[in-house]
Amino acid sequence: MSFNHQTIEKKWQKYWLDNHTFKTTEDKDKNFYALDMFPYPSGAGLHVGHPEGYTATDIISRFKRMQGYNVLHPMGWDAFGLPAEQYAIDTGNDPAEFTEKNIATFKRQIQELGFSYDWEREINTTDPEYYKWTQWIFIQLYKKGLAYVDEVAVNWCPALGTVLSNEEVIDGVSERGGHPVIRKPMRQWVLKITEYADRLLEDLEELDWPESLKDMQRNWIGRSEGAEVAFEVENLDHSFKVFTTRPDTIYGATYAVLSPEHELVAAITSEEQAEAVKAYQEQAARKSDLERTDLAKDKTGVFTGSYAINPFNGERMPIWISDYVLASYGTGAIMAVPAHDERDFEFAKQFGLDIKPVIEGGDNTSAYTGDGAHINSGELDGLNKEEGIRRAIELLEAKGIGEKKVSYKLRDWLFSRQRYWGEPIPVITWEDGSMTTVPEEELPLMLPKTEHIKPSGTGESPLANIDEFVNVTDPVTGMKGRRETNTMPQWAGSCWYYLRYIDPKNSDMIADPELLKKWLPVDLYIGGAEHAVLHLLYARFWHKVLYDLGVVHTKEPFQKLFNQGMILGEGNEKMSKSKGNVVNPDDVVASHGADTLRLYEMFMGPLDASIAWSTNGLDGARRFLDRVYRLLVNEDGTLSEKITEQPVGSMEKVYHQTVKKVTDDYETLGFNTAISQMMVFINEGYKSEQLNIDHIRGFVKLLNPIAPHITEELWEKLGGTESITYEAWPVYDESKLVDSEVEIVIQVNGKLKQKATIAKDMDKSEMETFALSLEAVQTAIEGKTVRKVIAVPNKLVNIVAN
């Protein structure tokens, strides 16, 4: 007999919606905030990868409600961004309508999976009542001096008519559409995330996050200590600075390299080299930073025709340009020490430049990067690395040509996009050159509706074409001004959405401070590892700014974070439309049911593992739920006669073991092993002639967070008059986890005569009396004298007789 998942799931989804079952409670003394990374509502709808993380947070939310917590478990939509705009450009449709339609699909799919979201808290980043506060936060950043305009060399994609982030450029072409990308300087809004670099680094220590993820953030921030050194250009009134972590190797600096974009390149390039330098700069502009720093690629470069002077030994150092030096890192210039740096060594070999060892221990076949005594280094000779660095910095500072410095790989956050479908930046530039933010009482600054959202082509956003939006007049002074036409990146709305869920309808502030105190930090945040750096770093940055403003009272937004693994196609390949291996959850819900999909995805393996989808595995998950239903319900839908009010001793131990194991495993997100234990319980249930009703009620509660529909149905059949949602979580009895009886071996002269079940911890004399009373033993010792009886508690009795 199989249960009818379609009827049961529709029935309970309607019940939950009609009864507002998952409306966030506020009346208990414990709070738990379980958050999903909210989705971008694409045209494709949900795929089976989405529900994995959503099911995990849903299990924890349902589990915590039963444990007596107020649970905040919301859902919303990260709905601005490139794909909707690209669709609108391709089809001529309005991105707002497209987005609305996609959200409706996502919401239907999510509701059909039985997730216990409080839909009264639903948010949408494109809702003016939401982005009013995204704009408000931008204004606070501006007031604090953390938002500024700069000319930045950016990834410009002429075909898309926009600037792309480094992550959106792959091998010199746009990730979307494969269009060529070049580097060109443009006026951009930038946020000063670097001001928070040390705090972003230090506060990672306090977080319960995977260590691998913390390391990714540490590497992205990339803090390094060293020195900044000034180099004079020979015969020209110019100098440039380099940052180095190894100022002690300065005597081994035999050439210098500037990035092709360095501001000094034009001024120091000789006439003979001008053509080669210009051609090289154009070539470098077509590469992404990632390609340029690829260690495996051959080094390229061009001599500028000028020389720098080594400030320690006075030697001439040819100045080259090469794309392995980035304008955005350090000072955009390096002193090259080929004897002790792998990249510098390869470059020197390629172009026949001098290699001068200044640390003992190497040979001339490769760069020596180990420690050793300094040589060929004047007064640094004989010192080791640490001493050498310290002394070199003292000498630099004494000569006035350098100083101790901390550098970061982290760059300020390029915040503007030359697109239409994003939050307008609330800034006006006036004809006298001054700049002001839009008065806060006038927020939200609405995104104007327009038919023409093709990029302007000039690098400005399509908003630049809408005169009634762009042109403003100050009502007091009559001065004319222009609104900012860049929009915010998609990251903006997702930087703070977890705060808005706490108080989503507040029109006076982001959220009530008392509610923020009550719910923050987020107790559990689950999402994909692809957001390990950017989203999480940006959200942490904004949170720290809001902390400094007194808006929030915690230093960090997300206390515990977990990355679910990826669900791959059946052949262990990533699911993609082009491979035709995408599994649509709608199909699975129709054929097997939402409970089966949830159970299967949690049973595939550990939550953080990447595992291939298997139709057999899905069938197995359904068979288990059928077995649960068959054990408890008769063909006619009534409760099985096996279920009794009487105690059933044979099931005591496995029941209490199951409560303990499932509770412990849910706490650690070990859902696959929790399910295994529930399978053990059901197997034992089939062997038992009777089932105690309290055991069954407890079991149904344990299964509920994973399979909520079937368990609501079973709960009703067990006499429940309300939803199982707020029933108390089962507790186990420690004393019932151990057996009250044990099986022992009975031997005569070392030969097995019988196995017998006795009370656990029976004392030796009782064991002897028991063994001697057995018929098999009496037969074996008939006519013999018992010489000795050896009893080993809980194990065996051996009777020696002859």
From Swiss-Prot:
Domain of life: Bacteria
Gene Ontology MF, one: ATP binding
Residues annotated as binding ATP: 577
SUPFAM superfamilies registered for this protein in UniProt: Anticodon-binding domain of a subclass of class I aminoacyl-tRNA synthetases, Nucleotidylyl transferase, ValRS/IleRS/LeuRS editing domain
Catalytic activity: tRNA(Leu) + L-leucine + ATP = L-leucyl-tRNA(Leu) + AMP + diphosphate
Annotated motif 'HIGH' region, positions: 39-50
Cysteines engaged in disulfide bonds, as pairs: none
Enzyme class: ligase
Subcellular location(s) per record: Cytoplasm
One cellular-component annotation, GO: cytosol
Chain location of the short sequence motif 'KMSKS' region per the record: 574-578
Pfam families: Anticodon_1, tRNA-synt_1, tRNA-synt_1_2, tRNA-synt_1g
HAMAP family: Leu_tRNA_synth_B
Family designation: Belongs to the class-I aminoacyl-tRNA synthetase family.
Protein name: Leucine--tRNA ligase
Natural source organism: Macrococcus caseolyticus (strain JCSC5402)
Source lineage: Bacteria, Bacillati, Bacillota, Bacilli, Bacillales
